[in-house]
Design a protein with these regions (language model features):
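Bacterial N-terminal signal peptides
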Residues: 2-14
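N-terminal low-complexity/intrinsically disordered extensions
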Residues: 1, 19-20
Length: 353
């Protein structure tokens, strides 16, 4: 049966098929004991990203490139150390993303971009591929590490997504660190906002100097996906959103199935790029669905979904890992800050195409 026909039927509503019509594996075949899972998944895997966009070697100084690479290496090392100890993929992805959130070079946490009114609002999500449990937070103004609050929402709130004041009140109740808005101020992000404001003023005929605006001035995201020694997948994503966004705007990062998704049966995905397009394309879940229902490989599914984003008019990229440890890192921009652990345990970081 054509896989796209199956997907169309599946999305139309609950239908019942004979087992041989779809050739889906039985639940008994999918379930394994912990010992069996450990034997089958001796290796671990980790992939990270620090955002995709207009990243050109000619526009980045050697010093700045070293700083980006060092930040990628720190995030990768933090997550990999956890996996090497036999701990969970959830712990590894959270740890890697926290490193990004503490680094002013990346658009998450400390390095979050500014809204149109000069404030910082952050989104994050985390998902457990073993249980399909997920936690997401949005429009945060005072949370130092949004990814940790997202995990707390998943594990203690009884909800999947919380935002704004309610999410921050929940954080206070549970000992999550809050900071003043001035903590998130960085000259580079403030200057990016001023460049965009000046360009807008120039376009509307109000004078002002026309300045070159790049994707890096506008947006960015960080994320991690991991496979642990128990065969469990996880994904985590965090972002400051888009420079000059309206207060209250929420992108794809905290939308489960769009910017963040994990399912042990298929893969874990974290996306970066034009959030509105990634939401409309349900990027994370679509990669999983193409693998589950169409039998595509991880790389085929990831590229197919990114091609769909491009057809809609969006740019960006994604990172993904499947239950066998295969990885995919496609992007349709000039660069994406990224890293992964190779089969020999070597940490690899890359920036350009």
């Amino acid at each position: 049966m054509n896989c796209f026909f199956v997907l169309a039927l599946f999305s139309a509503g609950p239908l019942v098929f004979a087992q041989d019509q779809l050739a889906l594996p039985s639940a008994a075949n999918e379930l394994r004991s912990d010992d069996q899972r450990k034997m089958q998944n001796e290796k671990v895997g980790l992939v990270i990203h620090g955002g995709a966009g207009t990243i050109e070697r000619s526009k980045i100084t050697p010093e700045r490139e070293r700083e980006y690479r060092a930040g990628l290496e720190r995030a990768l090392a933090a997550g990999y150390e956890i996996l090497k100890r036999g701990e969970s993929s959830l712990d590894a992805t959270e740890a890697a993303v926290r490193v990004f959130e503490d680094d002013p070079h990346f658009n998450a946490g400390k390095g979050a971009v500014f809204t149109s009114v000069g404030t910082n609002e952050m989104d994050a999500a985390i998902m457990d591929g073993k249980t399909l449990n997920a936690g997401a937070v949005a429009a945060l103004k005072h949370i130092k590490n949004p990814v940790s609050l997202a995990r707390l929402v998943m594990e203690r709130s009884g909800h999947v997504m919380m935002d704004g004041e309610g999410a921050e009140a929940f954080a206070k109740e549970n000992g999550i660190e809050l900071v003043d808005q001035k903590y998130f101020y960085t000259p580079e992000r403030w200057d990016a906002l001023q460049k965009i404001k000046a360009a807008e003023k120039n376009r509307t005929g109000g004078g002002g100097k026309g300045l070159a605006i790049t994707d890096q001035d506008r947006h960015g995201t960080v994320g991690a996906v991991a496979l642990d020694a128990h065969g469990d997948l996880a994904a985590a994503t965090s972002t400051g959103g888009t420079t000059n966004k309206r207060p209250g705007r929420i992108g794809d990062s905290p939308v489960i199935g769009a910017g963040t998704y994990a399912n042990n049966a298929t893969c874990a995905v974290s996306a970066t790029g034009d959030g509105e397009y990634f939401i409309r394309a349900t990027v994370g879940h679509d990669v999983s669905a193409l693998m589950e229902y169409c039998g595509m490989s991880l790389k085929e599914a990831a590229q197919s979904v990114l091609d769909k984003v491009a057809r809609l008019g969006g740019t960006g990229g994604l990172i993904a890992i499947d239950r066998e440890g295969n990885i995919a890192l496609p992007f349709n921009t000039s660069g994406m800050y990224r890293g992964y652990v190779d089969p020999n345990g070597k940490l690899v970081v890359e920036i350009y195409k």
